[in-house]
């Protein structure tokens, strides 16, 4: 039996039974008793399946049915929409309204209601069959749409996985409803499912095509942007390299990069001139060439000032001049008295921004007063006693961790040693006598390897020692290490047992090199260090010393909880540092064993011309003799 036939049957039954229905307003019959109402509800619950929405209304309502309630839920919302013409639909809707009521308030007879329920059960079966038909139709639509979208998906699968997902999403049918939602919406969905299927398949094809085109455009744009970014990264990398070079080398790096950039500007200008027909830019070329020459001259001044060749910039851009060679080979090396830390002296305050470093800068009272005030503030927040004990118990451990993290890359090779200490230069000459050099606190070999590299003395023996085992390993494992002349061992200068380093006999060392090592010892270790140092030095030997000076920029910059005691600090990595004055250094070394040869303070003003900053650095340098 079809749905249309069922509706017609409902209409005929309603006409036949219309006279039997009594209007409560006109006849004023009393309502059914409670027992009859209960029996009616029991019959309803047993006879009507719960899947049909109409049953729920009759189970929860009394016999008297309000026409307004029935109007809110007409039967046509619960029945599937048949594929019939418009006239059948209108007739069906009219008959359904008649089933519910014949007037404003209809009193339904129990027998009539049971007959109606039996017919409606038949309608529920039809509804179930129509639901199954709609599910089958939906599955067929899904298969059709999937079949349409599959070729596009295969094309787009090679390009991008996201396209495949979008095509699949476009071709898939709508999500399944729950049973109650399906019963409520089945009529509307059946009427439009064919149209939706066609639209879905069309959208799948259009979506896959549009996504393919948009994805291809995006990929092309990404490639273009990536090329641009790579070009910018390369440019920035070159700038960063020149910047880092300038930071690591106070004088040479900045001017060398400036020279390179100035030369590049000249080259760029020449390229532009070729395209500027008839335009004379000779004046600009001459100006840039003059600027380049000035930068070259400044670079050569910096090289002479530092006393070393430039190995950080463009070697083709800056070549050594006769002035540089004569300065380093003639006037400076071999000169022992007095110390000469540099030649660039600041005579006029207005010239301070002309260079990035000035030598022999005397501190005024204002600078000293500012440094003392900052140090007083540091004393208000010293290192706690518990932490102080940890830092002082095993200082070698913190230096070992330091070299584990930084390896040999932290400090630069000290190529200025043979200029500031000509005795080292004399010891490495080919015609020099047999000599033993002992570097204490060798670290990663930044002093050891420059001496070994320049050595021409077949009778030279150089020993490197450090109390950090990892530092000694770095020296031994370096490609520059030459066991023919060099030896490396672990040794603590302030060891309380007075043990000598491995491979060193008592009073066998001619020159002891102490470059930035003595500052790592605590003041209560100085006396023991002097005893051990005296044991290894020959009579007539020398001690070469350089370390941090009092009021140095690094001392003034220390923050809270860093000061251990006067002029003695702990860094953030746990390593300790002391800042010496000439008076304190003289007191330590000449107290018992050694004689003062010379002591000097290297004061230098570093200038950040871009940020207009002045930074005062201070180092103490000395040579001590061992009595005969």
Curated annotation (Swiss-Prot):
Which ranges are annotated Polar residues under compositional bias? Answer: 22-31, 196-207, 231-240
Write down the top EC class of this protein. transferase
**Which GO molecular-function terms appear in the entry?**
actin filament binding; protein-macromolecule adaptor activity; tRNA (cytidine-3-)-methyltransferase activity
SUPFAM superfamilies per record: S-adenosyl-L-methionine-dependent methyltransferases
- Gene3D superfamilies named in the record: Vaccinia Virus protein VP39
Q: Where found in the cell?
A: Cytoplasm; Cytoplasm, Cytoskeleton
Q: Which residues carry this modification: Phosphoserine?
A: 93, 321, 326
- InterPro entries (UniProt xref): Methyltransf_12, METTL2/6/8-like, SAM-dependent_MTases_sf
Show the GO cellular component annotation of the record.
Answer: actin filament; actin filament bundle; cytoplasm; mating projection tip
Binding locations of S-adenosyl-L-methionine: 399, 403, 441, 466, 492-493, 515
Enzyme Commission number(s): 2.1.1.268
Q: Which residues carry this modification: Phosphothreonine?
A: 150, 347
Q: Give the signal peptide as a residue range, or say none if absent.
A: none
**Bias type Basic and acidic residues, positions:** 1-18, 32-42
Q: Which reaction does it catalyse?
A: cytidine(32) in tRNA(Thr) + S-adenosyl-L-methionine = N(3)-methylcytidine(32) in tRNA(Thr) + S-adenosyl-L-homocysteine + H(+); cytidine(32) in tRNA(Ser) + S-adenosyl-L-methionine = N(3)-methylcytidine(32) in tRNA(Ser) + S-adenosyl-L-homocysteine + H(+)
Q: Which UniProt keywords apply?
A: Actin-binding, Cytoplasm, Cytoskeleton, Methyltransferase, Phosphoprotein, S-adenosyl-L-methionine, Transferase, tRNA processing
State what this protein does: S-adenosyl-L-methionine-dependent methyltransferase that mediates N(3)-methylcytidine modification of residue 32 of the tRNA anticodon loop of tRNA(Thr) and tRNA(Ser). N(3)-methylcytidine methylation of tRNA(Thr) requires the N6-threonylcarbamoylation of tRNA (t6A37) by the EKC/KEOPS complex as prerequisite. N(3)-methylcytidine methylation of tRNA(Ser) requires the formation of N(6)-dimethylallyladenosine(37) (i6A37) by MOD5 as prerequisite. Methylation of tRNA(Ser) is also stimulated by SES1. Binds F-actin and shows weak F-actin cross-linking activity.
Q: What quaternary arrangement does the UniProt entry report?
A: Interacts with SES1.
- Protein name according to UniProt: tRNA(Thr) (cytosine(32)-N(3))-methyltransferase
- Give the originating organism: Saccharomyces cerevisiae (strain ATCC 204508 / S288c) (Baker's yeast)
**What phylogenetic lineage does the species belong to?**
Eukaryota, Fungi, Dikarya, Ascomycota, Saccharomycotina
Quote the gene name from the UniProt entry: ABP140
